[in-house]
């Protein structure tokens, strides 16, 4: 099992990223419109080389990148992560022609990607999706709807998962790369609690060909899961970044704000809550980084550890941000306050890329499977009799 600690160079890089996010990226984020793709912000991420670095990183470096950006500017973090989610399938499963077509624009921050998996009736149960890919002489026609899709409907292309074999469950899903200008493809933005762009995609006989297939036909579910398994710990890192931002603000506020003739930090009821916030944040951070390091090392038990990391980090971040709002009082409820923003932002990660309930199911399934395997192994291992004592010819106790 990986024992995790950061190298000094990694810690320094994280601080550089945080400063960069605060000074260079946050001003661009503040000029953007909530619920819309911020193309100037994406262009800046491309110019700074952060999008390119994301695609060349392992799970741990991705977590460091996302946490550091989230601590300084959640909009920048989200913009980067959504590009990664929509494009990682191309990086991992795309043909040379597909990579050449889409990756340069994404790396430069010019091309916007979307990851179109969820549907109105298939969120947590992704294997039950119903977007139909009906065979035609030249390929397929996509008919149906995707919902809760980040960057929709403004994305320039989407990685779309559709059912090519009815009744085959997760084994009958194919991944397609669908440009936004395909006939029959439309969409609508959704007005959501969280400020990043989310919308629907409607497919009315959208034509796709074999050149649009990502990976192999009927093997698209694996493409989706490979992407989500990489990104799941980093969702926890995003949550940790928000928790650290809320904790930083709370420590500063309670140290300078006076009540009853003394700083709030002198009140045990306050300081103990801050201590709890710090403890949960640090525990979540270590759990996330250890899961990511285990992924990079190819260790066993990664699905369980990744699920634990996402579950604990997102739930802890919700607690930390909520407590921070409480300790700041009414000022934190004003539109435009950092904590008002974090309060809206922190809720969604407990749902997307596998809700907390799904993570608990994964953890429990892995635990019971491991226990069953150990029991089966124990039953198959012959019991060895103790060696006889030559002096007594009796078994040694």
Predicted regions and their residues:
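Alpha-helical interface subdomain recognition
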Residues: 1-74, 105, 109, 139, ...
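Flexible, small-/acidic-enriched active-site or ligand-binding loops
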Residues: 128, 180-207
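A short core secondary-structure module
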Residues: 143-186
């Amino acid at each position: 099992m990986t024992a995790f600690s950061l190298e000094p160079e990694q810690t320094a890089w994280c601080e550089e990223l945080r400063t960069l996010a605060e000074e260079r990226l946050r001003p661009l984020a503040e000029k953007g419109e909530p619920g819309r793709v911020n193309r100037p912000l994406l262009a800046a991420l491309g110019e700074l080389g952060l999008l390119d670095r994301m695609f060349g990183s392992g799970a741990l470096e991705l977590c460091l990148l996302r946490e550091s950006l989230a601590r300084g500017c959640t909009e920048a973090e989200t913009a980067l992560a959504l590009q990664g989610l929509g494009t990682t399938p191309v990086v991992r499963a795309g043909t040379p022609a597909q990579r050449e077509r889409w990756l340069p624009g994404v790396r430069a921050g010019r091309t916007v990607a979307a990851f179109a998996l969820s549907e109105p009736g298939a969120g947590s149960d992704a294997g039950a999706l119903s977007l139909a890919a009906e065979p035609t002489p030249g390929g397929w026609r996509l008919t149906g709807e995707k919902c809760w899709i980040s960057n929709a409907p403004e994305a320039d292309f989407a990685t779309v998962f559709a059912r090519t074999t009815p009744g085959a469950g997760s084994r009958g899903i194919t991944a397609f790369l669908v440009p936004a200008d395909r006939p029959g493809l439309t969409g609508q933005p959704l007005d959501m609690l969280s400020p990043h762009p989310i919308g629907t995609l409607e497919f009315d006989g959208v034509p796709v060909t074999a050149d649009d297939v990502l990976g192999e036909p009927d093997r698209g579910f694996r493409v989706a899961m490979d992407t989500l398994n990489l990104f799941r710990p980093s969702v926890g890192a995003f949550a940790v970044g928000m928790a650290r931002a809320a904790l930083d603000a709370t420590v500063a506020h309670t140290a300078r704000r006076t009540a009853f003739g003394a700083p709030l930090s002198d009140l045990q009821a306050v300081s103990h809550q801050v201590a709890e916030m710090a403890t949960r944040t640090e525990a979540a951070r270590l759990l996330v980084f250890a899961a990511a390091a285990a992924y990079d090392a190819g260790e066993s038990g990664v699905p369980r550890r990744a699920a634990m990391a996402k579950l604990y980090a997102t739930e802890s971040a919700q607690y930390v941000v909520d407590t921070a709002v409480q300790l700041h009082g009414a000022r934190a409820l004003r539109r435009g306050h950092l904590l008002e923003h974090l309060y809206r932002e922190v809720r969604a990660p407990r749902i997307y890329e596998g809700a907390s309930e799904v993570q608990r199911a994964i953890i429990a399934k892995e635990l019971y499977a491991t226990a069953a395997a150990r029991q089966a192994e124990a039953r198959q291992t012959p019991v060895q009799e103790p060696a006889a004592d030559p002096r007594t010819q009796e078994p040694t106790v």
